[in-house]
Amino acid sequence: MSLISIVCLIPFGLIGAVNPIITLSAYAVLGGMYLFVVPLFLFYWMNNRWNVMGKFERLFIYGLVFLFFPGMVLFAPFLNLRMNGKEES
């Protein structure tokens, strides 16, 4: 990257994009959120609100499930979200 292009990036606060450590750490943080944090939150949300969700909330959650599908598939084999059945007396 030439000196002129680096100088042009300084006013916009994008000089950190030149440093590969900052770039790689940003990728790691965003990838971790995409694959781990948000899918686990979605599993938690769906498990707690499955029977009381409204139609717009359900539509929004299904959209997020579609968006974060790789992370959902990553955790699906390890999480049991089946509802409790009726106990026999």
Curated annotation (Swiss-Prot):
Pfam families: NdhL. InterPro entries: NADH-quinone_OxRdatse_su_L. Keywords: Membrane, NAD, NADP, Plastoquinone, Quinone, Thylakoid, Translocase, Transmembrane, Transmembrane helix, Transport. PANTHER family: NAD(P)H-QUINONE OXIDOREDUCTASE SUBUNIT L, CHLOROPLASTIC. Its EC number is 7.1.1.-. Belongs to the complex I NdhL subunit family. It catalyses: a plastoquinone + NADH + (n+1) H(+)(in) = a plastoquinol + NAD(+) + n H(+)(out); a plastoquinone + NADPH + (n+1) H(+)(in) = a plastoquinol + NADP(+) + n H(+)(out). Coiled coil: none annotated. The keyword NADP applies. The chain crosses the membrane at residues 29-46, 59-79. This is NAD(P)H-quinone oxidoreductase subunit L. One of its GO terms (cellular component) is plasma membrane-derived thylakoid membrane. One of its GO terms (molecular function) is quinone binding. The keyword DNA damage does not apply. NDH-1 can be composed of about 15 different subunits; different subcomplexes with different compositions have been identified which probably have different functions. It is an enzyme of class 7 (translocase). It is found in: Cellular thylakoid membrane. NDH-1 shuttles electrons from an unknown electron donor, via FMN and iron-sulfur (Fe-S) centers, to quinones in the respiratory and/or the photosynthetic chain. The immediate electron acceptor for the enzyme in this species is believed to be plastoquinone. Couples the redox reaction to proton translocation, and thus conserves the redox energy in a proton gradient. Cyanobacterial NDH-1 also plays a role in inorganic carbon-concentration. The gene is ndhL. It is a multi-pass membrane protein.
